[in-house]
């Protein structure tokens, strides 16, 4: 599953995982475990946890594929992920399908900022200076403008990412997204 942050890819990944009985490995879930286990004291350390989470995701996917299983990867994949994914695929010939959730940037940004204000969102994704929070230390909270959001994800190639067969989902309006229909496309692509 690929696409912009807050585009709906994780919700569909969980749905597809249950319907297909295929495990989903979500980089954000791994990051949250790393935030809670290791934490970070500055933005550089937080970035290292992001890199570690991506490496753990690829390592785990390789192990599942080694055992003859299938796997769903959930991440806002970017151009920089192509090399590592290509290596996994080279070592494990498999049917690769990208389900990319596209969304108008303005709407993705609105959802992104709304999600970061949700109390159920893990604070490690929002805090920039340190996690867990240290009493008496004011932490910077990410504050991205719509313009910087658009530039960041355009520059990184999130909206053009694709490996293998591509299924594009316009997720600008969640009400128009049909999970059963996407699942049917996915199943048809697996044949």
Model-predicted segments: where are they?
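Hydrophobic anchor at the beta1->P-loop junction of P-loop NTPases
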Residues: 1
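The conserved Walker
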Residues: 4-5
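Conserved glycine(s) of the Walker
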Residues: 8
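Conserved substrate/cofactor phosphate-moiety recognition/catalytic segment
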Residues: 11-66
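Conserved nucleotide-binding/hydrolysis micro-motifs of P-loop NTPases
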Residues: 29-31, 102-107, 174-175
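Glycine-rich phosphate-binding loop used to anchor ATP phosphates in small-molecule kinases
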Residues: 49-96
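Conserved phosphate-donor/acceptor-positioning beta-strand/loop module used by diverse small-molecule
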Residues: 92-113
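Small-molecule kinase domains that catalyze NTP-dependent phosphoryl transfer to phosphate-bearing small molecules
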Residues: 117-177
């Amino acid at each position: 599953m690929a696409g912009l942050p807050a585009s709906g890819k994780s919700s569909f990944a969980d749905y597809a995982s249950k319907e297909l009985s295929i495990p989903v490995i979500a980089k954000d879930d791994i990051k949250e475990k790393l935030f809670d286990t290791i934490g970070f004291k500055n933005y550089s350390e937080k970035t290292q946890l992001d890199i570690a989470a991506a490496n753990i995701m690829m390592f785990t996917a390789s192990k599942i594929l080694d055992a003859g299983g299938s796997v769903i990867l959930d991440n806002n994949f970017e151009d920089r992920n192509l090399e590592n994914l290509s290596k996994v695929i080279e070592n494990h010939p498999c049917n690769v399908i990208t389900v990319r959730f596209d969304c108008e940037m303005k709407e993705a940004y609105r959802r992104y900022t709304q999600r970061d204000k949700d109390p159920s969102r893990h604070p490690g994704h929002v805090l920039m200076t340190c996690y867990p929070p240290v009493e008496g230390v004011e932490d910077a909270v990410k504050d991205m403008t719509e313009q910087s959001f658009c530039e960041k994800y355009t520059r990184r190639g999130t909206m053009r990412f694709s490996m293998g067969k591509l299924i594009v989902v316009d997720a600008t309006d969640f009400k128009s997204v049909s999970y059963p229909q996407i699942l049917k496309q996915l199943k048809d692509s697996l044949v």
